[in-house]
Swiss-Prot record:
Gene Ontology biological process terms in this record: proteasome-mediated ubiquitin-dependent protein catabolic process
CDD domains xref list: proteasome_beta_type_3 (cd03759)
Compartmental location: Cytoplasm; Nucleus
Protein name: Proteasome subunit beta type-3
Length: 207
């Protein structure tokens, strides 16, 4: 089967702006080089009015993790009588992954959203929950090598939504063109400070 991290393929990127956060992901599901489905795989989920979750990696673990975190976030809402914020979500996922470190989930999560004080938040972690929330962008998936250079070159602090959208489109399209394990369509989900979202489709190579 080869590298289990590359088995299903994925491309995921998150950018933190001045008044919005955005996640972009491809829509391909495959078994290594064999494409199984196109245009249907969701890797970006909305956990609350102020929090987005992106998951790249083995698709079975992606769906299992999402359902577990969705359940935990709903319980948090019931117990605390308020919606979970992205920093608390990141801590929750980190704890969940570390708990399963001896039989890990093969995923790379990216969490984006807004804290109660209105500040944007962006964090990511490895498969055992080591959290990194110190940068303006995060990347994950088999296309990471192709995403990294473009993000380091073009992503700046406090970018506006009008700057982020065309940049993410350019980055995800360029990366999926070079990675055989990802592509076949993509989309960008933008979350604004007022809780509104936009889901923008991106055309990519379909071969």
């Amino acid at each position: 089967m080869g590298n289990i991290w590359e088995y299903n393929g994925s491309a995921l990127i998150g950018i933190k702006g001045x008044d919005c956060v955005a996640l972009a992901a491809d829509k391909r599901l495959g078994c290594s080089y064999q494409t199984l489905t196109i245009g249907n795989e969701e890797r970006i989920f909305r956990l609350s009015q102020s929090c987005l979750l992106g998951l790249a990696g083995l698709q079975t673990d992606v769906l299992t993790t999402y359902r577990q975190i969705r359940m935990k976030s709903n319980l948090y809402h019931l117990q605390e009588d308020r919606e979970i914020r992205p920093r608390a979500t990141a801590k929750m996922i980190s704890s969940f992954l570390y708990k399963h470190r001896f039989g890990p989930y093969f995923i790379s999560p990216i969490i984006a959203g807004f804290e109660a004080d209105g500040k944007p938040y962006l964090g990511a972690m490895d498969t055992i929950g080591c959290l990194d929330d110190c940068t303006n962008f995060q990347i994950a998936g088999t296309a990471s090598d192709f995403l990294l250079g473009l993000c380091e070159t073009h992503v700046k602090p406090d970018m506006s939504e009008d700057e982020i959208l065309p940049l993410m489109e350019q980055i995800i399209r360029s990366a999926t063109n070079r990675d055989a394990y990802s592509g076949w369509g993509a989309h960008v989900v933008v979350l604004r400070r007022d809780g509104t979202t936009s889901d923008i489709p991106i055309s990519t190579r379909m071969d």
